[in-house]
Amino acid sequence: MTSSVINVLNKIKDLDIFEDDLYFVGGTALSYFIKHRVSEDIDIVSPKILKYKNIIPIMQDLGAKKIEDENTFSLRLAGMFPDEYILKFILDDVKIEFFCANRPIQKELLKQIEFTTYDNSKLKILDLKQIAKLKVIAFFQRDKIRDLFDFGEILENKIVSFQDILQISKELKNISSEKQLIKFILDKKEEKDDENVYLDEQSRIDLSFLEIKKAVLKKIEKIGNQKCKT
């Protein structure tokens, strides 16, 4: 985490809104456990519709600025009220996103929630394995460089079994084999104006999409070789 993220977490961690079903997840929550990269934003998930009438005024009283999400228009077209599904704020230059887990695979994962608390506060942080599975789901749904890097670290640290990853990929993308997974990764394209991945806040060196992709493919190849030996 950046020092800015830590400062913002300290500002929000004891807010009354976190007495509801809200859980700290995403790349920053993952880095809290495995220290794999520098993370710059805060993601909060709820298995239920967001209580926006509580969240918005409390965040604004803290000095946070509410910003519009790029999916707002499509949510309205689908007959949904956007603030019930996603809320984004900027506080001290740190993005904070609250979102409702409205996809069936997310809902199923969050039926059995395990969590601890962040720094003994009101802010609940999901169990590492559940954070990682939500990250794997995100990896299959978008082409963000940080999702690709996090996916590689989940493989490297064996947080989610390769079999469980293939179960998720089969449900989302009909990918059920190592070969199909490799093709899926090879076909991934770098998003324009995507966020960067770096490992040290003090001496920052951004990793490229291509080098991260190559590293992830090597990790999958290593897993395949280990399976062949057993």
Give short role names for the model-derived ranges:
Residues 1-230:
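Compositionally biased terminal segments of proteins
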